[in-house]
Amino acid sequence: MLFRSGTGRTDAGVHALGQVGSFRTQSHLSAQDFQRALNALLPPAIRIVGAEEVGPDFNARWSARGKTYRYRLYRGRVVPPMIWRYVLHYPFPLDEDAMRDAAARFVGTHDFAAFAASTGTEEDDKERSTEREIYSTELVRTGDNEELVFTVCGRSFLRYMVRKMVGTLLDVGRGKLAPADIDRLFELRDRSKSGPTVPPHGLVMVEVQHEEAWHL
């Protein structure tokens, strides 16, 4: 008998480097044997890069204490063919200092209703909690200065939240919004006032942080 648990779901088209899963089983196979067996069954784009036994109280989802996401914007004129699946091409002028100011305002505990996907009904939107805690944000140039990369670490995230955050930062960079408008969006709770939801392919879930004492 086997019971499964994953850290969480990513939006369709979003990549994951640090997805974590856990399961309970009555099998006597070692963790390494499970790793080899699973990799033999999975498609090449999905790999189990490590496996180990954990304590009975560990759950990949409920033991998670934070997640780190990264969104890559390619700023050059021509996207190299080896990376086009993993970046959003955005060669337009941007005020990156204003974007960094805006990104810093995400840090802390706020109501991210303006940055979340709709549940489909106004009643459901009002009932669900949209308060989230963001631990840190960073906006830096990488890749021979051709890429602008937004990294965010938080306790948990709403559906489409990171992609809406990036879209809003781009609106700040283009001068459509001011950095101080981030604070106003927390109060308004109106997703129509925030930036667009950027495409999923530039986003990757980099890491999931778990409690320290989960190893056997």
What are these regions (language model features)?
Residues F3-L216:
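Structured-RNA-binding interfaces characteristic of tRNA pseudouridine synthases
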